[in-house]
Amino acid sequence: MRIKDAIIKIFYTRKDVSEIYLVIRDRVKGTSEIPFSNIERVDNYYIYLNDGETVIPLHRVIEIREKDKTLWKR
């Protein structure tokens, strides 16, 4: 399953995404966790956060986590 499909599936099948996080590669920090509740939308190449300015390329996502459980991993 592609990362875009995994994100969309979670949004449409889960009522509560407050404990789900994207783990991304960050050039400065190494890895970062982004709460799913901060995601506004996703297209074929990018994830757009609801702060109005942050855009994350899909290739930077390495994992989707819920608490200690891995839902998707590259």
UniProtKB/Swiss-Prot annotation:
Family to which the UniProt record says this protein belongs: Belongs to the UPF0248 family.
Record InterPro entries: MJ1316, UPF0248
Protein name according to UniProt: UPF0248 protein STK_06965
Domain of life: Archaea
Organism: Sulfurisphaera tokodaii (strain DSM 16993 / JCM 10545 / NBRC 100140 / 7)
